Amino acid sequence: MAKLETVTLGNIGKDGKQTLVLNPRGVNPTNGVASLSQAGAVPALEKRVTVSVSQPSRNRKNYKVQVKIQNPTACTANGSCDPSVTRQAYADVTFSFTQYSTDEERAFVRTELAALLASPLLIDAIDQLNPAY
């Protein structure tokens, strides 16, 4: 079990020169969802990440790992507007593994996704909203 602690994400953004520090906000004792967010004066404007791991159940035989990212964008009209969210960007990634999967198989899927997200196909699809042809 990993301890919930500060996570620093470097080399992010379109130019790869941004850093984001996510501070632990706690783990919901009811559903086990761990929350991290960027420290900010206005909670609604904080970038957030949640991570959860669901155990297999009687009806669902697989482990489910869910990672959600929420990045709000603040109003920037010459700095004259009240702090408010003008739009949101979301990402929701779900991994599903059988109880018999190995850590090697799970690591392969995780690193495969990281490499795929860095590929020109996904960069064009996500950044430019261009479909593949």
Curated annotation (Swiss-Prot):
Record key words, sorted: Capsid protein, RNA-binding, T=3 icosahedral capsid protein, Translation regulation, Virion
Effect of residue 96 to L: Decreased RNA-binding to the viral operator and loss of repressor activity
Residues carrying the site annotation RNA-binding: 90
Places the protein is found: Virion
GO molecular function terms attached to this record: RNA binding; structural molecule activity; translation repressor activity
Alphabetized InterPro entries for the sequence: Levivir_coat, Phage_RNA-type_capsid
GO CC annotation, single: T=3 icosahedral viral capsid
Function: Capsid protein self-assembles to form an icosahedral capsid with a T=3 symmetry, about 26 nm in diameter, and consisting of 89 capsid proteins dimers (178 capsid proteins). Involved in viral genome encapsidation through the interaction between a capsid protein dimer and the multiple packaging signals present in the RNA genome. Binding of the capsid proteins to the viral RNA induces a conformational change required for efficient T=3 shell formation. The capsid also contains 1 copy of the A2 maturation protein.
Assembly behavior: Homodimer. The homodimers binds to the viral RNA via an operator hairpin, but also to many other RNA sequences in the viral genome; this interaction probably shifts the virus from the replicative to the assembly phase and ensures specific encapsidation of the viral genome. Interacts with the maturation protein A2.
Protein known as: Capsid protein
